[in-house]
């Protein structure tokens, strides 16, 4: 990876950010149908900031197979995990083609699958078998907890219990459902505001395994809250591809929503004096970023 454009000036603020291949601080993007050229442009600009690439719901069913294979090959070469949206697997389940689905996903070049029951009922034994089936076909299983219908939403503890069970059965990560709207689903109310009590319940029940959750958070206020709660290396999903750099700036404290707290903390601790005359200094002498570390380094929610 080449040096970033402003490293010589603000390189210190990036200290603490996990680097690829990341086990935490994942960014999962949703792709509704990017072509090869657009995908290449995105990877040139922000490829090292993307960890998971989801071809959302059933969109990949309409892409020419050779184009999809080339696209997935390019993404995999960059170390990005690729998978079709869970709704496509749910359709295959309804039509009795789930094993064929796994075989075909692997043949096309996907490296993972999303296993969900957002639309259909899925008994626990079938959920467990799907996780095993994915592994048997060389695919990394990523499950999703939650329902897409705003009128039928499971409680926070139910989401956490299912996530823990999925991880025990072999899921590598568990995504918390929010859809692409981020409203009226899961941990968000009808206006897209975070239900803080729900996040607290899930976090408490998950314990250290909360780091295996990918919180779908398509809206800026949701991303801000989760970064403030869990630190810059929280796993976030359903990020529009055009918002990857904006999210990274939010993680690093390079946007108002997170930088304001960093500036206040530096002033409070005497590391920055608004009245002081600036002296010539090297990037290494600049104060670090006290507000955007892992929650394990500073305590969840402490900035």
Describe the role of every protein-language-model region.
Residues 61-74, 91-100, 118-139, 152-155, ...:
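Active-site-adjacent beta->alpha loops and helix N-cap segments on the catalytic face
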Residues 1-70:
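Conserved N-terminal beta1-alpha1 strand-loop-helix module at the mouth
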Residues 57, 108, 112-119, 167-183, ...:
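Glycine-rich phosphate-binding active-site loops on the catalytic face of alpha/beta enzymes
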Residues 33-46, 93-104, 156-165:
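Short, acidic/polar
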Residues 24-31, 51-55, 82-86, 113-115, ...:
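Hydrophobic faces of well-ordered beta-strands that scaffold small-molecule active sites
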Residues 3-16, 200-303:
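C-terminal alpha-helical cap/extension of soluble enzyme domains
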Residues 42-46, 75, 104-108, 134, ...:
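Generic structural signal for hydrophobic
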Residues 32-34, 57-61, 86-90, 117-121, ...:
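Active-site-proximal loop/turn and secondary-structure-junction residues that shape catalytic pockets
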């Amino acid at each position: 990876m080449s040096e970033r454009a402003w490293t010589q000036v603000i390189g210190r603020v990036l200290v603490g950010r996990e680097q690829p291949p990341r086990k935490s601080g994942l960014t999962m993007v949703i792709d509704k149908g990017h072509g090869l050229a657009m995908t290449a442009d995105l990877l040139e600009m922000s490829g090292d900031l993307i960890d998971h690439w989801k071809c959302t719901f059933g969109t990949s069913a309409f892409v020419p197979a050779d184009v999809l294979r080339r696209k997935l090959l390019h993404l995999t070469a960059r170390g990005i995990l690729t998978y079709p949206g869970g709704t496509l697997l749910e359709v295959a389940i309804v039509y009795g083609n789930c094993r064929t689905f796994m075989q075909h996903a692997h043949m096309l070049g996907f490296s993972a699958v999303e296993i969900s029951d957002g639309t259909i009922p899925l008994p626990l034994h079938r959920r467990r078998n799907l996780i095993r089936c994915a592994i048997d076909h060389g695919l990394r299983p990523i499950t999703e907890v939650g329902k897409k219908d705003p009128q039928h939403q499971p409680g926070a503890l139910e989401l956490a219990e299912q996530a823990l069970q999925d991880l025990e059965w072999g899921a590598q990560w568990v995504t918390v459902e929010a859809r692409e709207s981020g409203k009226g689903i899961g941990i968000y109310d009808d206006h897209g505001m975070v239900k803080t009590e729900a996040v607290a319940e899930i976090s408490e029940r998950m314990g250290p395994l909360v780091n295996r959750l990918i919180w779908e958070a398509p809206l800026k206020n949701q991303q801000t809250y989760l970064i403030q709660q869990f630190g810059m290396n929280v796993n976030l999903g359903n990020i529009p591809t055009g918002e990857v750099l904006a999210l990274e700036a939010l993680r690093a404290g390079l946007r108002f929503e997170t930088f304001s707290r960093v500036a206040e903390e530096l002033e409070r601790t005497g590391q920055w004096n608004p009245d002081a005359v600036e002296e010539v200094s090297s990037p290494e002498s600049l104060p670090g970023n006290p507000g955007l570390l892992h929650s394990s380094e500073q305590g969840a929610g402490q900035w």
